[in-house]
Amino acid sequence: MSGIGWQTLSLSLGLVLSILNKVAPQACPAQCSCSGSTVDCHGLALRSVPRNIPRNTERLDLNGNNITRITKIDFAGLRHLRVLQLMENRISTIERGAFQDLKELERLRLNRNNLQLFPELLFLGTAKLYRLDLSENQIQAIPRKAFRGAVDIKNLQLDYNQISCIEDGAFRALRDLEVLTLNNNNITRLSVASFNHMPKLRTFRLHSNNLYCDCHLAWLSDWLRQRPRVGLYTQCMGPSHLRGHNVAEVQKREFVCSGHQSFMAPSCSVLHCPAACTCSNNIVDCRGKGLTEIPTNLPETITEIRLEQNSIRVIPPGAFSPYKKLRRLDLSNNQISELAPDAFQGLRSLNSLVLYGNKITELPKSLFEGLFSLQLLLLNANKINCLRVDAFQDLHNLNLLSLYDNKLQTVAKGTFSALRAIQTMHLAQNPFICDCHLKWLADYLHTNPIETSGARCTSPRRLANKRIGQIKSKKFRCSGTEDYRSKLSGDCFADLACPEKCRCEGTTVDCSNQRLNKIPDHIPQYTAELRLNNNEFTVLEATGIFKKLPQLRKINFSNNKITDIEEGAFEGASGVNEILLTSNRLENVQHKMFKGLESLKTLMLRSNRISCVGNDSFIGLGSVRLLSLYDNQITTVAPGAFDSLHSLSTLNLLANPFNCNCHLAWLGEWLRRKRIVTGNPRCQKPYFLKEIPIQDVAIQDFTCDDGNDDNSCSPLSRCPSECTCLDTVVRCSNKGLKVLPKGIPKDVTELYLDGNQFTLVPKELSNYKHLTLIDLSNNRISTLSNQSFSNMTQLLTLILSYNRLRCIPPRTFDGLKSLRLLSLHGNDISVVPEGAFNDLSALSHLAIGANPLYCDCNMQWLSDWVKSEYKEPGIARCAGPGEMADKLLLTTPSKKFTCQGPVDITIQAKCNPCLSNPCKNDGTCNNDPVDFYRCTCPYGFKGQDCDVPIHACISNPCKHGGTCHLKEGENAGFWCTCADGFEGENCEVNIDDCEDNDCENNSTCVDGINNYTCLCPPEYTGELCEEKLDFCAQDLNPCQHDSKCILTPKGFKCDCTPGYIGEHCDIDFDDCQDNKCKNGAHCTDAVNGYTCVCPEGYSGLFCEFSPPMVLPRTSPCDNFDCQNGAQCIIRINEPICQCLPGYLGEKCEKLVSVNFVNKESYLQIPSAKVRPQTNITLQIATDEDSGILLYKGDKDHIAVELYRGRVRASYDTGSHPASAIYSVETINDGNFHIVELLTLDSSLSLSVDGGSPKVITNLSKQSTLNFDSPLYVGGMPGKNNVASLRQAPGQNGTSFHGCIRNLYINSELQDFRKMPMQTGILPGCEPCHKKVCAHGMCQPSSQSGFTCECEEGWMGPLCDQRTNDPCLGNKCVHGTCLPINAFSYSCKCLEGHGGVLCDEEEDLFNPCQMIKCKHGKCRLSGVGQPYCECNSGFTGDSCDREISCRGERIRDYYQKQQGYAACQTTKKVSRLECRGGCAGGQCCGPLRSKRRKYSFECTDGSSFVDEVEKVVKCGCARCAS
């Protein structure tokens, strides 16, 4: 009977438990989010599949993680799973049977992983799988049983892999397959047996492979022709004559095999031994092979793996679980820092595990679970800092354990209790703290003397360096905070160390007086009192820090600058019973500030700026006993303000300016009744109640008469005078603001600051926590910072369009996780750094158009990002580089975003303006948030770029070492003292010293600097060519190749040996000059003969025997007629016309783009092209604000024109005014825009860049438009009957100035070449595409050049300089003329001068007073620096050194006295002057001189010729007596 009862009870319990299991909800894995039957774990950086996935899960998202391995247990039990997303991980291994429980699986995505192979029969249990994506992996082969069991697959994607082998029958079971992608692989051959069982196949991609089109692939051509819609673009890659041919177009006879070839069915078996390793006798040896990960798919029978001395960093889950017979595993001397908890799972035979010499810091829980046979465990030379108490619980047979040389400070009691067979243990070289928690280890080692390495204590100091096994146990004791920090070490929990800048004593953490502005991140959990007083806190943020401090009881925030406490700031502080907020800057108190303080008993709010206590200020603080509001600015307390404080026993309201009007009437009676208030709070207003205790005022005296109706608790908000406020919306638009106005309500949700003068995002915006919209458009903001939008967690809309933004810092938008709309339209942004939008997870719309985006590889991420969910509407276009110009960010393929060489410096300088070196003349550049950059100029220069000299000599105008001197009495003038050998206004002329030279024997004089050189004839030498040479002397004989040298009157001649010619017999005579080589043979010269090198096919001594005749090939361009000046070039053996700018077509026969450079030009299209129902589309680019694009009609007309940069379309049917529509977009940015015009009988539609069309409908009367009139493009003729358009309001009637291309009328591309071409209309769109001429007309001068024809009153290359310069003929004496306007100027005086015209001298310090010149005199340089000008024969800074004797060439007049007349040579004469000193008592003087005749002119008008002695050589000689 009892047995039956127990059975019944067991059955009942089982039934109840079964029901509970089905009803009770299962927990969601940590970090993941669960909704219904969907589990979302994407993008969490997971390294393995999380455990505890609910059994009822139908959809599991694991994409975007770091998972490397899929094991058999990862998805065990998930029998309801239908969708599994595993793309974008690092999966390299999938164990066989990993999907065996997924009976309901329908869709599986494994694309973008690292799979190289996958086991056969992997999908055996997934009978309902119909979509499988394995693309973008590294799969090399498809084995025969790869998809066995997955018979319902309809969509199979294998593209972008490395597949080179597909075994026969691999797809045989996939009879329902509809989509198969094999493109972009390495496939060379295929068997027909692989594809002849797919009757439903509708999409098949095989292009971009290495197909070898020989006889074995002939079946594929017929197969593709029978299915013309599949296998498109499949091409042969070999043999060479078929390369690039479509397989379906190759005839069957062309599929030939050379020689004897037999086709073997491919076998895709993969070697189990890795290529880098050796395998023998069940041992896999991979030592020192540079491996970075554990090799996979090893033989399952191996018993030993040697992986030491590699670079492995991670041991993934189940890395060795397939190898059940493994006995020895060596992983020493790697870089292992991460071990999966189940890394060694299932290795029951393992008896040796070597892990020394790695970077392991912690042993995961259950790491050694189940290793019952382990005898040797080496963990030495790692960085292990803790051991869990159960780390070795299954190691009953362990003999040796080495933990030598790690970072262990303590070991929990019981850690080694399971090691029943332990014989040797190494614990030395660990920094053990020998406190009370390590006492057990000393006792253990006394009882079991197995520690042989000599483990010692590191601290405390009294036990330092003593052996643990030799210390008495009573000396192991705890003091201070040691007990708190290490008492949980058995769970690998050691509490945090004392924070930097703080002091810890017992359970008190003191961080006061440290100028902190936020709470330290790492506070020990044992903290009971936290002191943060006397710091720089302004806002207490909700960081969740108090959730980590379960023991906290008291917090001190006194003497800070706190103005606000965020909601949730104290969340988790449920145990805190005392908070001190004394001496801060709080202005109001709200209950949400103290949310989470359920146990608070004391709240100190003394000495703040609180003006009102509301009736909801202290809701939720029912435990507070003491509340101090002493010394605030409280004037009003709302009725019921203290009703929620049920435990309140002490209330301090003293030292507050209470206004005892009708709003405070309730408080007097409340104070009398409660009797919990400290002292007697007194009235301060009205005057007749001043200093009267509130509780003593009669109820009838609390009145609001005489205008005393102030109530600080009134909900009315303030509004700045510059703004308008409605509820929580504040509008401050178009007010010229440069700073944020004061008085904006704290609860503002929408703030409009557009149309102002802000240059930076106001820092004060971070104080407004409730903002959901900020509009800062149309300001002058040039820079953003990483903190521009901090603390704006609720922001939904941020508008920054039409500013001067050039650069987006990487973390500008961090924290804006709620943002939905971001507008950066109309700025100067070229690059957005990758990761800048990482936190914008809720963003649905990004406006970034009208920016010069530089779309290289660094912007590929942004293109992918906007494409992912169409977050950008297709407006943003690229400005470069190269072919990316004008491409849409949204639709351009990602592969087009490539980097070709270094990025242009102008692009890089947008985020670092100083990179472009804008500061001239060695100025120092500093980045500036408003002006982009600022230059600190060196002495002598000024201006924004330091490019303006302060006076004329600063720029060193005197060349070749000349000295600059400022002129007196002239504006900015200077004069130069030239160095010897130079003359001219700027010392730019090198004097011709050869004009009077002494070169002899017909030698040639070569001018130098203040000297000359004589270039001698071959037979002479010497300084003046005065010595004759013997050329046939042994050391000078120039004759080569044993030829004979013979002296001649003019020099020498060489008598050459046979076979050589030339002046020096140095040329081997070319015997090929008169050769008999035939048929284009190459003649090779030899000594006294030659050899004929025959072309291919020719033979004979002179190549006279010809080969069989072959027909010469002709160039493909010979009969290919390129038009309009185009050049024919050959690409891939095909002729192609390279068109000139503006032309298009196979032979460049059409002109499709023209440039309107003359504002009186237009094109005329015949009327037959335009009917009542017409669609006109064209692309335009211009910088102009106005101009006519299209015009048709007479009095009644259709006109499309530019009006203030927008497109205006008007339809005048005779009514006044004409009907008109305008585009939303402005298009005068220089970029191309698409304009589309659609006319119907009663409507006109205008669309720009594919945007929403603007329409004119329901016209006032039937149109009388003359459709027989022509259509004018780019302008119109100046006839009287179109004057109405020119005079219409807002219209200027001027012709278009810019570029028009791709004009379509009713889908027909128009050829401008067929229209009359006026002057001022040029083919193509460059170089006058941009508005380069400021006040004039651009005229192209070549394909890439241009000239500007200036308007009246302007001049310069770009017509940007006015012709009337007021500084012409100015009267500034010692200064610079500065124009004030077109008619007047002012003088900026040089240093030392003053007055209106800088004509008055001022006292000036003479720098020459500080310098002494021994043999010379002091001069001032052009920049005002003193220097010594030395006398002849002396040098040095002070002219104190005598130079050695040398001849200094001077150029001067010779002078003579003839009676009373002074005479001099008619020109300057060059001569030597001997200067310097000599040693040994000798004198410097002439060694050689000449006499030369010169003409002289005298002061009395006479002239004569006389000889003059000239010195030609100087040196040291005996002094003259």
Swiss-Prot record:
S-S bonds: 277-286, 434-457, 436-478, 498-504, 502-511, 660-683, 662-704, 719-725, 723-732, 855-878, 857-899, 914-925, 919-935, 937-946, 953-964, 958-976, 978-987, 994-1005, 999-1014, 1016-1025, 1032-1045, 1039-1054, 1056-1065, 1072-1083, 1077-1092, 1094-1103, 1117-1128, 1122-1137, 1139-1148, 1299-1325, 1333-1338, 1350-1359, 1367-1377, 1372-1387, 1389-1398, 1408-1418, 1413-1428, 1430-1439, 1445-1484, 1463-1498, 1474-1514, 1478-1516
LRR repeats: 56-77, 80-101, 104-125, 128-149, 152-173, 176-197, 301-322, 325-346, 349-370, 373-394, 397-418, 526-547, 551-572, 575-596, 599-620, 623-644, 747-769, 770-791, 794-815, 818-839
Keyword Secreted included in the entry's annotation: yes
Signal sequence, start to end: 1-25
InterPro entries: ConA-like_dom_sf, Cys-rich_flank_reg_C, Cys_knot_C, EGF-like_Ca-bd_dom, EGF-like_CS, EGF-like_dom, EGF-type_Asp/Asn_hydroxyl_site, EGF_Ca-bd_CS
Residue ranges constituting the CTCK domain according to the UniProt record: 1445-1520
Gene3D superfamilies: 2.60.120.200, Laminin (2.10.25.10), Ribonuclease Inhibitor (3.80.10.10)
GO biological process: aortic valve morphogenesis; axon guidance; axonogenesis; cell-cell adhesion; dorsal/ventral axon guidance; in utero embryonic development; kidney development; mammary duct terminal end bud growth
Residue intervals of the Laminin G-like domain: 1152-1325
Disruption phenotype: Mice show significant axon guidance errors in a variety of pathways, including corticofugal, callosal and thalamocortical tracts. Mice double-deficient in SLIT1 and SLIT2 show retinal axon guidance defects and a disorganized lateral olfactory tract (LOT).
Summary of the tissues where the protein is detected: Expressed in developing eye, in the optic stalk, and in the ventral diencephalon.
Keywords tagged on the record: Chemotaxis, Developmental protein, Differentiation, Disulfide bond, EGF-like domain, Glycoprotein, Heparin-binding, Leucine-rich repeat, Neurogenesis, Repeat, Secreted, Signal
Residue ranges annotated for the LRRCT domain, each copy included: 209-259, 430-480, 656-706, 851-901
Record's subunit section: Homodimer. Interacts with GREM1. Binds ROBO1 and ROBO2 with high affinity.
Protein name, entry field: Slit homolog 2 protein
Natural source organism: Mus musculus (Mouse)
